[in-house]
């Protein structure tokens, strides 16, 4: 049996519910993701509470600031024994290199966020970016690789082309859905689509966290991708 590629996003404000879900799905997921909502509400203390349950934690802070500020932020969390941390690739090579250097003495996987899955082609027009979304994502992935990052966060729509050019990079894919609703994310695909294209990790949130039975929801997801 292959290991679970699922990362469960605990994007909720209620730490009690977050801990309940984490306990329920322990052993069925690769990691749980704690994002900005959770971190601003519960901070390092809340992260520690989740880590103590024994499930690897992906701290999704999407850091984006001048290099020194990002490095100081990383030093504040690097001793938490988290599994993965995110920064924005658009912060630039200097910021990414500084972040990678700050984590060089740890086993934390630093992942660069390319373009948020809530962003679509119309947004690029508003931003004044005169290239396709896919071309821009590939440009950002190239910058991340040049800066020494070994992982990026991208939409499922870019997985295939990224995997074709960078066969060794770790691809973390949000925007995974099981029905036609896309919520606040525009660039979505099914789990099997993303895995077939070369994704390493799939980030799934609401289908699990809003289920009355999170364990059953995870089991259904794993069955759908052939992991039992």
UniProtKB/Swiss-Prot annotation:
SUPFAM superfamilies: Ribulose-phoshate binding barrel (SSF51366). Substrate binds at residues 11, 33, 60-69, 117, 177, 185, 205-206. Keywords: Decarboxylase, Lyase, Pyrimidine biosynthesis. The keyword Lyase applies. Homodimer. Pathway: Pyrimidine metabolism; UMP biosynthesis via de novo pathway; UMP from orotate: step 2/2. PROSITE patterns: OMPDECASE. InterPro entries: Aldolase_TIM, OMPdecase, OMPdecase_AS, OMPdecase_bac, OMPdeCOase_dom, RibuloseP-bd_barrel. One of its GO terms (biological process) is 'de novo' pyrimidine nucleobase biosynthetic process. The active site is at 62 (proton donor). GO terms for cellular component: cytosol. PANTHER family: OROTIDINE 5'-PHOSPHATE DECARBOXYLASE. Catalyzes the decarboxylation of orotidine 5'-monophosphate (OMP) to uridine 5'-monophosphate (UMP). It comes from Anaplasma marginale (strain St. Maries). Its EC number is 4.1.1.23. This is Orotidine 5'-phosphate decarboxylase. It catalyses: orotidine 5'-phosphate + H(+) = UMP + CO2. It is an enzyme of class 4 (lyase). CDD domains: OMP_decarboxylase_like. Belongs to the OMP decarboxylase family. Type 1 subfamily. Coiled coil: none annotated. The keyword Lyase applies.
